[in-house]
């Protein structure tokens, strides 16, 4: 039968075996099978009384009920800690479920995402409160800041023979928290110094996170004394995974946090930020922000994936109101004070510059198109790409300006090769004649906008190819299009990163039609599922392509 593997001498009295199987199946209907199996075994083993069987079944029922209640509490706690991030929370729930069924050894999470979106809050007010002892006390939480750190002694101390030496932060946490299994949150791991000393820090962290070694961690101050940190829970927090040592990154269970949507920011403003601001200013129920005002502040005065700048701005506005109330005791106020967009622009922020968003042109132009960019901080937008002929001694010499880095430069050369091979032979002959003529005008200068900002990566390869094709063939590019995608020598358009950031930022610039790689279909589907009801996507068109020829048909005006 289904439980025949449990029907062995010595196991019959151990309800825990059935409980383990029961939990593993996660199906409450299986309890009937458990009861039938107990009855069957009881018939074969007359030494078992009905009372003993009922007691074991009650234990199973009770244990399963406690687990169900606990997992429900876990979800509630995580939701209360931060708004949104459902995928990240689900991964944490899965790991906690694994701890219930399996071993409860230490673990290492990697919280990956832009700043200000709730990574620390989810760890401190969420995960910490989910992990409680039998007295209901939350697992102790400690934080270590690694941004710019260049000294390994921060973590594992100095040798005690040095004057003024002391132990490292890991031992200090154990001393402060009085336990060997705290939650240790190590922030800004991607900002660790790139020097040799920085490599030492990476080596220490790699040792700390290795389950085969972290049961014998040694602090230099306590030489020869092993510290068992195998039960500790480590959380590394970082913005850009590409800046982290690959061996260290391989040690962590990566959990990606997405940028907050406009709706997310609205909810967080009303449920978390404003109540906190009002409380600190002593102005509860005395000020009111409508949704339209909050949207205006978010769109016009912040350019971020999270809510740090938004929180700072709301503190500033409420602080101004508080100051006004304190200075004008004789003035009568109609509470709650309703903040308007006019108040923001003409009173509180009359000297503050709004975020400047460069709009895409209205006219179709030759040798000009809209690329797209995304940063590790979760921002994105359009990247204007210009190409013009210039006098040159070399036919089709490329002059690359705008602080382009190595990968982007290589992409430019590939784009030129592809664009040249797409150009009709008659047009090639015309260009050669121009080069041989007295004008001597056939070098090409390619310049992406914002010349003071470094740019790198292959994702602009596709749009650069179209810009060069436009220039070589004297054909304008549709102004309201934007494209992202890496170009291959074959003309294939391949996957890129940060698609959602690129689209959201480009919408602000006035882009109406988007071209993206077919290989990014999953990324686009995730994006569209989240934003399909957003007003900003009304009348916006999206096209997926896997070859540059498809993009040419869409974007080149003929």
Describe each region flagged by the PLM:
Residues 64, 133-136, 178, 240-250, ...:
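Conserved C-terminal "switch" segment of AAA+ ATPases
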Residues 68-112, 419-420:
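Pre-Walker A (pre-P-loop) alpha-helix and adjacent loop at the N terminus of AAA/AAA+ ATPase modules
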Residues 108-145:
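Walker A/P-loop
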Residues 131-165:
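AAA+/P-loop NTPase substrate/partner-engagement loops
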Residues 177-181, 217-237, 287-289, 440:
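AAA+/SF3 P-loop NTPase mechanochemical coupling elements
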Residues 190-226:
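Conserved catalytic/switch belt of AAA+ P-loop NTPases
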Residues 279-286, 299-374, 455:
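C-terminal helical "lid" subdomain and adjoining coupling/linker elements of P-loop NTPases
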Residues 336, 358-370, 378-558:
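Peripheral, non-AAA+ core regions of ATP-driven protein-machinery
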